[in-house]
A protein has these predicted regions:
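Forkhead-associated
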Residues: 65-156
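Intrinsically disordered, low-complexity acidic Ser/Thr-rich regulatory segments
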Residues: 1-99, 113-114, 160-168
Length: 168
């Protein structure tokens, strides 16, 4: 293995460790308590398709309808504003360093699948959109239909994690 590869692997490892520290610091609630709160919230939802943010930077419920929903982040202080407008903003932890979430990262669509699925497309993001927990990167050229219980993340660390929830 050459030095450049070793350095790149070390940087990636350090970046992942920082993300894990962010997750434990920003998400101190006991996991059993969090599961109970999430279950209670899901019980109050109307019938339909939802994508639920589970990470520390994306803790919301997104209702999936017939119009596409674009996921991404705002430009950092070091970037020019982006022309594309996202519908759902993920607050990436890194304000000045490399960001895991692209400004236009992925698109969710409810009209391209059956009534119990959600179509997920990666918008050629720099860090990819990943199916979890199998860590399979979604091909930007091939939209993927997700069903109830499927999870995906924006970026490979799994910090910006989302769950597909279908309530009948």
């Amino acid at each position: 293995m050459n030095t450049d590869t070793e350095v790149a692997m070390l940087i990636q490892s350090l970046r992942f460790q920082c993300r894990l520290r962010d997750l434990s610091f920003l998400n101190p609630a006991d996991s059993d308590e969090k599961v109970a709160r999430i279950s209670a919230s899901l019980g109050r939802l109307a019938a339909g398709r939802y994508v639920i943010g589970l990470g520390p930077y994306c803790g919301e419920v997104i209702k999936i309808g017939s119009h596409p929903i674009r996921l991404g982040r705002h430009a950092s202080l070091l970037e020019e504003p982006h022309e594309e407008v996202v519908d759902y903003v993920v607050n990436d932890a890194s304000l000045l360093g490399p960001c895991e979430v692209s400004r236009l990262h992925a698109t969710l669509n409810g009209s391209d699948c059956d009534k119990e699925s959600v179509m997920l497309s990666d918008e050629t993001s720099s860090t990819g959109t990943w199916l979890q927990p199998q860590m399979q990167r979604i091909d930007p050229e091939t939209p993927t239909c997700l069903s109830h219980g499927d999870m995906f993340s924006l970026g490979g660390s799994g910090t910006n994690l989302f769950l597909v929830f279908v309530k009948k």
